[in-house]
Amino acid sequence: LRDGQACFNINSLVLGQGEDLIAQPTGVAQFIALGAALGLPRQRMSSVADAAVDWMDADGEVRAGGAEDARYAGRAEGYRNAGVMMAEVSELRAVQGVDSALYARLRPWLCALPTTRLSPLNPNTLTVDQAPLLVAVSHGRLGLAAAKAVIAARPAGGWSTLDAFWAQ
C-alpha cells in the first residue's frame, strides 16, 4: 500500500485556475529543494522551475530561466507551450531544460494532481526512501540525512498532529 499523495505536485509550481495561472513561490522553492535533495544543481532546478511555470502560465512573459512560445516554435519540430496545468507528469519532458536524464531522475518523485495546491504530505505514511519529499516541503531547511532520521524515528502510533511532527 502506497500513499498516492506522497509526491511533489508539478502543478503546485503555479497558482490559479484554468488559463489564469501565475508562479507560486512556495511551490517553486519546494521543487528546487527536491532537486537539491536528489543531488541536482539548484541553478538548473531553478531554470526548469521557471520554464515549467512559463509552460503553464498564459502571460507570454519569459521568466528568468524560462521559455515561452517563441523558444518552442523555433525548434525543428515546433510546438507551443500549454498555457494550462499539466495533465500528466510526462508533459514535463517537453519543457525547456528537461532532458531524458533529468526527467528520469525527477519522475519517481512527481505527480500531476488536478489542482495547484501544494502536495499534502502525510509524515505518518512516508518511508525513509521518500525523505527527499520531506526535504522539499521544508524548503531545504531539513537536510536529507535529518529527514531520513526523523522518518526513521517516527513513533509507533505516528504523530498525532503536524505540529507534533514539526516539533521533532
Language-model features and meaning:
Residues 1-168:
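Compositionally biased linear targeting/interaction segments
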